[in-house]
């Protein structure tokens, strides 16, 4: 069971900022920016690459949540959205999650 599944199940404390039927959003415990949130689907999908085609609509819902949280946290004018896919992509927890980072200039990714 991943740490995110344990958070979703209420077994591990977190600083929750959003929850609905399909997603939970929490503050990252090791933030890389003044605002660093994780948007996590409740369904245990290991990687972005593993989302079934007929469930890709979840990503549209996640995008709307990102927009709402960016506005709520005052970063709507500039933020970064990141999904690490697989070990080679830097994914450390194999439960799909989206990083929302902002609150300072983040610079370009070359």
From Swiss-Prot:
UniProt-listed InterPro entries: Histidine_triad_CS (IPR019808), Histidine_triad_HIT (IPR001310), HIT-like (IPR011146), HIT-like_sf (IPR036265)
Domain called HIT: residue spans: 3-110
Residue positions of motif Histidine triad motif: 95-99
GO molecular function: catalytic activity
Annotated Gene3D superfamilies: HIT-like
Protein name: HIT-like protein CPn_0488/CP_0266/CPj0488/CpB0508
Lineage top rank: taxon: Bacteria
Species assigned in the record: Chlamydia pneumoniae (Chlamydophila pneumoniae)
